[in-house]
């Protein structure tokens, strides 16, 4: 049942900071979402502004909301992930995809390359498979998702096999070399127009716990007592932390990308912490990247960004466009 509010006060009616093509710019229409996913009705409640919402501190509510969004906006009838795996906010994931489309368009006379000719590698796809779902359903791109976790790979396979709209468009590969990012999953004949990645942010489990507690203390300081200090969006160890944290992870990716310099148009990775950019830029300079771009994205109060780099020269770019982007 969708709740009715007597309070017309609203904090914000539109998420105007999101990408112009992002379908999640407006406030969630919970009536429509509940039609797509009836079980969502059990989680709908009124927030402090009198607007319909869900308890984002409740992992089950977050997962059910994601299921409804993926059904309603992207035609995905079945979507489920095991407990404890990353359950990401859909609007932010969609933003990355749309800005990646703009990145390709900037090299293609402003026209977004669409269809199965565009190949994308999602490094660390996770069990949720969200980036490939959005990228394929929005632009028709073909995806390979890699992950070190066999459960994540199996879950992606199940999601794809359970949705006819995704079959043949998304494949998941197990990364058996945990210290590698491209080696082991990038096959000899693979050519990718894009790579994308949401890298582990923290340097260790203890650092992650400290950061979570700090944020929780900040929430309590604002007298928001309904929040709980839980990882409401989940995440396994490989999804949340690694040696060297975000800066170390992306720098390793940059170094490894040199081996695939002429087999990818744009390598990209999210960078959550602005302070990590200088180290990443230094590594990009060291490896001789020809083009480097930093694209900022705003999502509510949060500013995020991704770094993109390419090794292609002008002649290679022209050849790529003429041979791979003509639908």
UniProtKB/Swiss-Prot annotation:
Disulfide bonds: none annotated. Its EC number is 2.1.1.181. It is found in: Cytoplasm. It holds the Pfam family Methyltransf_10. It catalyses: adenosine(1618) in 23S rRNA + S-adenosyl-L-methionine = N(6)-methyladenosine(1618) in 23S rRNA + S-adenosyl-L-homocysteine + H(+). The keyword Phosphoprotein does not apply. One of its GO terms (biological process) is rRNA base methylation. One of its GO terms (cellular component) is cytoplasm. Keywords: Cytoplasm, Methyltransferase, rRNA processing, S-adenosyl-L-methionine, Transferase. InterPro entries: METTL16/RlmF (IPR010286), rRNA_lsu_MeTfrase_F (IPR016909), SAM-dependent_MTases_sf (IPR029063). GO terms for molecular function: 23S rRNA (adenine(1618)-N(6))-methyltransferase activity. It is an enzyme of class 2 (transferase). HAMAP family: 23SrRNA_methyltr_F. NCBIfam families: PRK11727.1 (NF008725). Specifically methylates the adenine in position 1618 of 23S rRNA. Belongs to the methyltransferase superfamily. METTL16/RlmF family. This is Ribosomal RNA large subunit methyltransferase F. It comes from Marinomonas sp. (strain MWYL1).
């Amino acid at each position: 049942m969708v709740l009715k509010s007597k309070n017309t006060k609203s904090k914000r009616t539109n998420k105007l900071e999101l990408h112009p093509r992002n379908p999640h710019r407006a406030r969630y229409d919970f009536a429509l979402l509940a039609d797509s996913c009836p079980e969502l009705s059990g989680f709908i409640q009124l927030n402090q502004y009198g607007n319909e919402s869900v308890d984002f501190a409740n992992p089950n509510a977050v997962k059910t909301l994601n299921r409804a969004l993926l059904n309603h906006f992207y035609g995905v009838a079945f979507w489920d992930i095991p407990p404890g795996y990353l359950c990401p906010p859909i609007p932010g994931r969609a933003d990355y995809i749309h800005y990646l489309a703009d990145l390709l368009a900037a090299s293609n006379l402003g026209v977004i390359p669409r269809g199965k000719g565009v190949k994308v590698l999602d490094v660390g796809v996770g069990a949720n498979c969200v980036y490939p779902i959005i990228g394929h359903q929005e632009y028709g791109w073909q995806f390979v998702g890699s992950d070190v976790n066999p459960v994540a790979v199996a879950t992606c396979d199940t999601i794809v096999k359970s949705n006819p709209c995704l079959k043949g468009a998304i494949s998941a590969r197990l990364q058996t070399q945990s210290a590698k990012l491209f080696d082991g999953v990038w096959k000899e004949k693979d050519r990718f127009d894009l790579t994308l990645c949401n890298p582990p942010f923290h340097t260790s489990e203890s650092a992650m716990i400290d950061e979570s507690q700090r944020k929780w203390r900040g929430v309590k300081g604002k007298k928001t007592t309904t929040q709980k200090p839980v990882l409401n969006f989940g995440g396994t160890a490989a999804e949340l932390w690694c040696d060297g944290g975000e800066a170390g992870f992306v720098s390793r990716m940059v170094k490894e990308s040199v081996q695939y310099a002429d087999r990818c148009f744009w390598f990209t990775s999210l960078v959550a912490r602005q302070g990590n950019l200088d180290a990443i830029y230094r590594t990009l300079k060291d490896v001789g990247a020809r083009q480097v771009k930093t694209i900022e994205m705003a999502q509510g109060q949060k500013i995020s960004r991704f770094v993109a780099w390419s090794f292609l020269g002008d002649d290679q770019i022209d050849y790529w466009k003429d041979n791979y982007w003509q639908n």
